[in-house]
Amino acid sequence: MDDTAPIDWKRNLYIAWLGCFFTGAAFSLVMPFLSLYVEQLGIQGHEALNLWSGVVFSITFLFSAIASPFWGRLADRKGRKLMLLRSALGMAIVMALMGLVQNIWQFLLLRAALGVLGGFVPNANALIAIQVPRNRSGWALGTLSTGAVGGALLGPLLGGYLADTFGLRPVFFITAVVLFICFLVTFFFIRERIEPVREKGMLSGRQVMVSLQNPHLVMSLFVTTLIIQVATGSVAPILTLYVRELAGQTDNLAFISGAIAAIPGVSALLSAPRLGKLGDKIGPERILVAMLILSVLLLIPMAFVQSPWQLAVLRFLLGAADGALLPAVQTLLIYHSSHQVAGRIFSYNQSFRDVGNVTGPLLGASVSASFGFRAVFLVTASVVMINAFYSWLSLRRKSNRELVSEAE
C-alpha cells in the first residue's frame, strides 16, 4: 500500500466505529453475570459477594486510569493504530484467560490486566480526531461515540442469553473471539501515516500541559469528563431499587429496570451525530454548556417522579443530552492541542473518565445510604450544575482572550 496516498478518513471512521462497537459489546457481555461468576469462584455470603463484585468491577477502571498516560505517550511516538492493535489483542488474550481462572485472586489479577491493556476507544478517538477535517470533527466524534454505546447496549442482552444457554465460562471465550475479530479488522483496514517522535524529543507530562495554548481550559475539560462519568455512574447502584420503590409489587421488575437502564443509550445513539454536526456549525463549546444545563434540568425532576414511566421519559431525554457531552469535550480537546501530543491529551482525558467511573457509584451508594434514593439525583444535579458554571467560565475566558488577541 502506498504510504504517500491520501488517507480516507471516512473509511477509517467507519472501521473504527466497528471496532468500538465490538469493544463496547465485548466489555458489556460479561457484566450481567459478573457477580454470579464471583460467586462461582467461591465467594459466599451477601456482604462478601457485594464487596468482591465491587472490587473486581472497579479495579479495571483504576488500573486503566494509571496505565492510560503511558499508552498515550507511546501512541504519540509509535502511532495510534499500534495502540489499537495492542489493546484489542491484549484484551482478547485476557478475556480468554478469565474463562480458565480457578479462584477469585486470579480473576482479580486479570481484571486489573484488562484495565492496563484496554484503551481501544480513546485511541480510536485520538486517531479519528487528528485525521478528520476540523469542520467535521464534531460529527465524526459524535458518530464514533455511537459505536461503543451501541455495543454496550447490545452486550448485556446478548451476554445474558449466552450465559443462560452455554454457561458462564464460555461467554469469556466468545468475548475473546469478538475482540480478536476487532484486532483483525483494525489490522487490515485502518490506515495511519505515522510521524515517529524519538524518545529524546518527547515532552514530559508537565511540558505537554505547558505547551498548550490554553492549559486551564484543557484541564477544565478533563474535569468535565470526570463529572460526566460521576453523574452517569452515581445512579447505577440505586436504579433498580429506585424503580422497585416506584413500581411497588411487580413480577417484571428486572425487565422494567433493564429497560430504564438502557434507554439513555438509545437516545444517545440518535442524538450524538446530530448534535455533533450542530456543534460543527455553532461551536462545540455551546453544545457542551447547553447540554450540561439541560442535564441539570432533567436530573432534578427525577427526584420527584411517581412512576417508573416518568423516570423512563426523563432518562430518555437525559441520554439525548449526555450523548453530545463527551464528543463535545473531545472536539474541544483536539481544537486546543497539537497532533504531536494528541495521544497523551486523550489518554489523560481517559484517566479522568476512569476515575469518574469509580467515584460515581461510590457517591451514589453513600448518598443513598445516608439520605435516600431521591437525594442521589439532587446531589448529582448539584455537581453537574457547578461543572456547567465552571465550564462556562473557562470557555468564556477563552473567548475573551481570543477577542483581545484579534484586537491586537
Swiss-Prot record:
Taxonomic path: Bacteria, Pseudomonadati, Pseudomonadota, Gammaproteobacteria, Enterobacterales
Short name of any one Pfam family annotated for the protein: MFS_1
HAMAP family named in the record: MFS_MdtG
PANTHER family (UniProt xref): MULTIDRUG RESISTANCE PROTEIN MDTG
Listed name of the protein: Multidrug resistance protein MdtG
Coiled coil: none
Highest taxon of source: Bacteria
Subcellular location field: Cell inner membrane
Statement: the UniProt record of this protein carries the keyword Cell division: no
Membrane protein topology class: Multi-pass membrane protein
Alphabetized PROSITE patterns for the sequence: MFS (PS50850)
Gene Ontology CC terms: plasma membrane
